Amino acid sequence: MKVANSLRSLKLRHRDCQVVRRKGRVYVINKTQKRYKARQG
């Protein structure tokens, strides 16, 4: 999982990426390409 300050560029890496909020943290998840998973931090 990649950790980044801003998720804007990580969200644009693939068209299936979506931003979700879990337990106070913001994540980018991708159901089709798992390698695009990321967290803000």
Swiss-Prot record:
This protein's UniProt keywords: Ribonucleoprotein, Ribosomal protein
InterPro entries: Ribosomal_bL36, Ribosomal_bL36_sp, Ribosomal_L36_bact
A GO cellular component entry from the record: ribonucleoprotein complex
Coiled-coil stretches: none
SUPFAM superfamilies assigned: Ribosomal protein L36
Biological processes annotated in GO: translation
Gene Ontology molecular function, alphabetical: structural constituent of ribosome
Pfam families found in the cross-reference section: Ribosomal_L36
Domain of life per record: Bacteria
Key word Chaperone present: no
Family the UniProt entry places it in: Belongs to the bacterial ribosomal protein bL36 family.
Listed HAMAP family: Ribosomal_bL36
Name of this chain's protein: Large ribosomal subunit protein bL36
Provenance organism: Cereibacter sphaeroides (strain ATCC 17023 / DSM 158 / JCM 6121 / CCUG 31486 / LMG 2827 / NBRC 12203 / NCIMB 8253 / ATH 2.4.1.) (Rhodobacter sphaeroides)
Gene: rpmJ
